[in-house]
């Protein structure tokens, strides 16, 4: 834990800084095996970078590219479903939340070690920005809403880490990617959405999309 703490202490989000500040240079004794800590660091940094990124640049396409970059050559199967598929499969909730945004929704599925005896599923909330929709949040309530996709980022970080460590478990990750925005096409309080399981849901507050 001490070694991991040292490694994580070097994190800085400087994507928008014109001149990088001096980086911390931490040297480790070569006899210390820090591979596991490095895997953990990579996963944590992935989440931090995405959470810190402004919503202007955190588009669904950008998020998907970062997931592809993260898993790289790992034995993880990534499937990207687009809006056309979501409509065909009756994902009324995902479509409803996203329909006020100019950015189309996606649904990502990750699969690792599906033949393992012990299987786990993670579902991560991927609202890339949550204005509240027509049930608009207050200005102060929106200040941190670029972080409303932290659940999705964490789910992908976990499956990457599990694969890197070669754990003998099966893991599936499900993450919708949407923006909840107000516009003339947004869902309204009183609208009824039909979910994939056939149930209907009346929307009383468009900010209850989670």
Give each language-model segment a name.
Residues 165-209:
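A glycine- and small/hydrophobic-rich beta-loop-beta segment
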Residues 2-5, 89-93, 132-140, 182-189:
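Short acidic, glycine/serine/threonine-rich loops at helix termini
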Residues 30, 81-84, 110-112, 124-126, ...:
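Fold-independent oxyanion-binding glycine-rich loops
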Residues 45-49, 118-122, 128, 132-145, ...:
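Glycine/charged-rich beta-loop-alpha catalytic/anionic-binding loops adjacent to active sites
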Residues 92, 100, 124-126, 132-133, ...:
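Glycine-centered flexibility sites
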Residues 53-57, 145-148, 206-208:
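Hydrophobic alpha-helical scaffolding
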């Amino acid at each position: 834990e001490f070694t991991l703490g040292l490694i994580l202490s070097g994190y800085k989000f400087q994507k928008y800084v014109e001149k990088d500040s001096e980086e911390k240079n931490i040297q480790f004794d070569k006899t210390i095996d820090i591979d596991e800590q490095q895997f953990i660091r990579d996963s944590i940094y992935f989440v931090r970078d995405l959470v810190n990124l402004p919503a202007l640049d955190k588009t669904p396409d950008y998020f998907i590219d970062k997931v592809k970059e993260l898993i790289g050559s790992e034995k993880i199967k990534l499937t990207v479903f687009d809006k056309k598929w979501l409509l065909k499969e009756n994902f009324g909730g995902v479509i409803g939340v996203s329909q006020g945004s100019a950015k189309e929704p996606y649904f990502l599925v990750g699969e690792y070690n599906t033949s393992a005896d012990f299987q786990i599923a993670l579902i991560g909330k991927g609202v890339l920005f949550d204005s509240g929709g027509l049930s608009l949040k207050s200005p102060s309530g929106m200040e941190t809403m670029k972080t409303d996709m932290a659940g999705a980022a964490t789910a992908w970080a976990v499956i990457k880490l599990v694969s890197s460590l070669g754990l003998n478990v099966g893991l599936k990750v499900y993450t919708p990617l949407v923006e909840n925005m107000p516009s003339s096409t947004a869902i309204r309080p009183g609208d009824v959405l039909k979910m994939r399981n056939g149930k209907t849901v009346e929307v009383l507050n468009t900010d209850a999309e989670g």
